[in-house]
Amino acid sequence: MTVTTYADLVAAISDHSPRIVKVSGTITNGGTTEMIPVGSNKTIVGVGSNATLSGFGLNVSGWRAEQVTQFKDQQCEVAYEGKFTYTRNVIIRNLNFVNAGDDNINVQCWSHHVWIDHNTLNKPGDGSVDIKRGSDWVTVSWNKFILSDKTMLLSHDNDAQVQDTGKLHVSYHHNWFNQTRQRHPRVRFGMAHVFNNWCDNPTSTNNYFIGVGMSANIYADGNYINCYGETTQDMGDAGPLAKLTWDASNVIVFGDGVEFNTGNAFNPRSFYNYTLDPAVNLPTILQQGAGAGVVVN
């Protein structure tokens, strides 16, 4: 089905029924900053190159009216794990996000099997793509991030150890970070594979590429770094369990170098096979291939 209004979009994506939802034109939210909850089994895809969500973002979670009423806004807490239907099997593709009052995309509350692909995500009020609260098996690929500060968070708090440990398996690849400042991503507890991304911000201050937080487990390879500030940074709370492998296939053309590199992170090839693009080719590849308007729907 094709939607052109905010009300139609809410109705189309908030339940758990399988549905392909095509967004046509620009959809605005009438002034609310609330994120729209996304239910299971949804493909949300923009039509053409200009499909735009303006003023709001998408919340891939169990945060919908019936759960809020039943659990009194506490449904994402550890005590309620397994007591409601988690959101799963979601694709968000070929959309432009502008002027979001909160996050552009939020994945939380044990949501799993989510693919965020070929979107253009302009500076939001908070995070651009945040993944947290026990979510799992997420891929963030071929997106263009523009001017964001808090770009991508993986786990929201050091107190989330019980909820997040053993989950938060996320692949980040072929993303273009254009004039963004930090969190590409910033990781706690999760297992993140960060490969073939381009950090493109040589002028901003207070910048870093990957933030290593409590018990993070990160494998980074084939990235092209042209960003002011630290390339990998201990956020001050990484602790003895944090691991990061900074592979020799990464290329740093500008930046303060690698502050944190234990060399003993997980091996992503134990999960899937992949072929790296040469890091030096990423500016050309991603200017042509990242963001909305590249895939045809």
Regions found by a protein language model. Give the residues of each.
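Extracellular beta-strand-rich solenoid/capping regions of secreted or surface-exposed proteins
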Residues: 10-18, 27-43, 52-91, 99-110
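Right-handed parallel beta-helix/beta-solenoid
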Residues: 1-7
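Right-handed parallel beta-helix
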Residues: 40-46, 68-71, 86-99, 111-125, ...
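Short glycine/acidic-rich loop motifs that flank beta-strands on beta-rich extracellular proteins
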Residues: 12, 31-34, 49, 54-58, ...
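Extracellular beta-rich repeat passengers
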Residues: 186-189, 193-297
